[in-house]
Amino acid sequence: MEAKAIARYVRISPRKVRLVVDLIRGKSLEEARNILRYTNKRGAYFVAKVLESAAANAVNNHDMLEDRLYVKAAYVDEGPALKRVLPRARGRADIIKKRTSHITVILGEKHGK
């Protein structure tokens, strides 16, 4: 059995969030929480919210035990980019892409200790 949570259209670059997600993949729920709590990256806040949502889904919807949960899979997909114009010299303009992310965390339950 597995529980899943997704945060879509999060306004942070996928490249930056992947650095954080790579830290928790395969870890136990408690260890992942501790890692995210002390990770000094903006993406850690968003990943922590998705992790807590997945944990709540596991306990409330799938009757899984919280102390047995681990991060089975965690990945970040790219969402649509917001295009913004940056005026430049001589009447030109550059396009700035404000990137968005879809953050997915899947928790599994370990059997036996």
Curated annotation (Swiss-Prot):
Top-level taxon of origin: Bacteria
Gene3D superfamilies tied to this protein: Ribosomal protein L22/L17
Keywords: Ribonucleoprotein, Ribosomal protein, RNA-binding, rRNA-binding
GO MF terms held by the record: rRNA binding; structural constituent of ribosome
Function: This protein binds specifically to 23S rRNA; its binding is stimulated by other ribosomal proteins, e.g. L4, L17, and L20. It is important during the early stages of 50S assembly. It makes multiple contacts with different domains of the 23S rRNA in the assembled 50S subunit and ribosome.
Assigned protein family: Belongs to the universal ribosomal protein uL22 family.
Subunit structure: Part of the 50S ribosomal subunit.
Protein name (Swiss-Prot/TrEMBL): Large ribosomal subunit protein uL22
Native source species: Thermus thermophilus (strain ATCC BAA-163 / DSM 7039 / HB27)
High-level lineage: Bacteria, Thermotogati, Deinococcota, Deinococci, Thermales
